């Protein structure tokens, strides 16, 4: 019952503003700034009044946090208005190309156990390989997003890369077809654009 502009965070005073940062993130469009509302009855009931390591947010805020899905995701809460004026957090509206995107809905397959007793994963009638090296793949896509941001990629191009990163980060855990995401989002072309720009 929290709005898209509110956060339940018992460790912070009501009315203060918090930047919510989840790592890795694709850019400032994945950093919502929310106002603390510690009077929300549903949040008090669910989290309690004394929690130091849990906050409550709206599902739309979670979507914006680089695909947080309420399965134990970690978010840093950074107050945005300190008296010394040292903390300045940039935020911008979410990318249109990310609205409503759900990696599990788009890339989760169906498990079948073969005659050999091993699990096989299928999507659209085709078997696909599961991800085994999340850190490596996440490093690749994070570096690409950083490079794209530096060279001034369009919002559409950034959305393609970030959608793929959302699939990659959950691919191993939720058995997602990350290779198909790589094709659908034409990640190879994005890599080529970065190479051409830096050459």
What feature does the model see in each segment?
Residues 1-76, 84-92:
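Core mixed alpha/beta domains of very large multi-subunit molecular machines
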Residues 67-68, 73, 83-85, 93-190:
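Conserved catalytic alpha/beta cores of large enzymes that bind or transform nucleotide phosphates
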Residues 197-198:
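Conserved small/polar residues in nucleotide/adenosyl-binding loops
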């Amino acid at each position: 019952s929290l709005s898209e502009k509110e956060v339940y965070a018992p460790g912070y005073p009501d009315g203060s503003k918090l930047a919510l940062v989840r790592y890795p993130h694709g850019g400032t469009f994945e950093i919502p700034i929310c106002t603390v509302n510690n009077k929300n009855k549903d949040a008090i009931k669910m989290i309690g009044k004394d929690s130091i390591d849990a906050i409550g947010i709206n599902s739309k805020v979670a979507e914006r946090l680089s695909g947080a899905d309420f399965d134990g995701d970690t978010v840093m809460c950074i107050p945005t208005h300190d008296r010394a004026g040292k903390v300045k957090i940039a935020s911008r509206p979410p990318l249109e190309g990310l609205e409503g995107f759900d990696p599990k809905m788009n890339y989760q397959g169906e498990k079948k156990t073969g005659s050999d007793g091993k699990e096989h994963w299928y999507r659209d009638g085709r078997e696909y390989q599961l991800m085994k090296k999340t850190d490596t793949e996440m490093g690749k896509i994070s570096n690409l997003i950083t490079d794209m941001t530096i060279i001034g990629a369009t919002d559409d191009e950034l959305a393609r890369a970030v959608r793929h990163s959302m699939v990659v980060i959950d691919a191993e855990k939720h058995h997602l077809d990350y290779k198909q995401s790589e094709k659908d989002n034409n990640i190879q072309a994005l890599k080529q654009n970065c190479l051409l720009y830096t050459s």
